[in-house]
Curated annotation (Swiss-Prot):
Protein name: Carboxy-S-adenosyl-L-methionine synthase
Keywords annotated in UniProt: S-adenosyl-L-methionine, Transferase
GO MF annotations, alphabetized: carboxyl- or carbamoyltransferase activity; S-adenosyl-L-methionine binding
Function summary: Catalyzes the conversion of S-adenosyl-L-methionine (SAM) to carboxy-S-adenosyl-L-methionine (Cx-SAM).
Assembly information from the UniProt record: Homodimer.
Keyword Transferase set for record: yes
Naturally occurring in which organism (per UniProt): Shewanella pealeana (strain ATCC 700345 / ANG-SQ1)
InterPro entries: CmoA, Methyltransf_25, SAM-dependent_MTases_sf
GO biological process: tRNA wobble uridine modification
SUPFAM superfamilies: S-adenosyl-L-methionine-dependent methyltransferases
Length: 243
């Protein structure tokens, strides 16, 4: 999955606009997310492992907020021969276009339906697996419960939700410590202080992380029988919930 180097915030801006998943971001997204999200590669690989365990024959798999298709590709490699259908959705035309290019580079018998649209408008049905990989944090907090309700209702019994998110911690010392460790991670991956500061300003109004307790309570309130965090590095985590 090719990507140009992310230098979108390398020069100073008089006014930093709110972050958008536009063509500029889509062109550098693979580099951006791997240099910004600790453990991203492991999360993507493990989503494929989970698909192998939970995808049932003749069912649907949803990648909600698919971006460039990394999770979709990981899933598709692990569910061959099960007559599954993957539905990958993103509201960015630029992401969908590049996702289509990435998917076309690999031959597979598992069909993928690409949808450019709002994940809140998609009806989930006959799903054995639903993936929300760093997507929910960009939705309005008031929309998150209804999305999870839609997912729960559309999952088959025993179906799996994978939810990856940046976390917020109410304990000030913990929040500061983990945030500092994340910033050090970004510095170690070549981001300058200017890039870090400007990107943070860009994301401030569009990304609203929840606490882990808020995630678990919201998930269990929909009826999911089991919940666990399977991965965490600093203030980034991936969770699983079983219907």
């Amino acid at each position: 999955m090719n990507s140009s180097q992310d230098n979108l915030f390398a020069k100073p801006y008089e006014h930093v606009s709110d972050f958008q998943f536009d063509d500029k971001v889509a062109g550098v997204f693979n580099d951006m997310i791997r240099r910004s999200v600790p453990g991203y590669g492991q999360i993507i690989n493990t989503i494929g492992d989970l698909a192998q365990k939970y995808a049932t024959p003749n069912s649907k798999i949803y990648d909600l907020g698919c971006s460039l298709g990394a999770a979709t590709l990981s899933i598709r490699r692990r569910v061959e021969g099960r007559n599954c259908q993957i539905i990958a959705i993103d509201n960015s035309e630029s992401m969908i276009e590049r996702c289509n290019e990435n998917l076309s580079a690999y031959v597979s018998e598992t069909p993928v339906e690409l949808v450019c649209g709002d994940i809140r408008d998609i009806k989930i049905e006959n799903a054995s697996l639903v993936v929300l990989n760093f997507t929910m944090q960009f939705l309005a907090p008031s929309d998150r419960e209804s999305l999870l309700k839609n997912i729960y209702q559309g999952l088959v019994p025993g179906g799996l939700l994978v939810l990856s998110e940046k976390l917020y911690f109410k304990e000030d010392n913990i929040q500061t410590t983990l945030d500092d460790l994340h910033l050090d991670f970004k510095r170690a991956n070549g981001y300058s202080e200017l890039e870090i500061s400007q990107k943070r300003s860009s994301l401030e109004n569009v990304m609203k992380p929840d606490t882990l307790v808020e995630h678990e309570n919201r998930i269990r309130a929909q009826g999911f029988s089991q919940f666990s965090v399977w991965f965490q590095c600093f203030n980034f985590a991936s969770m699983v919930a079983i219907k």
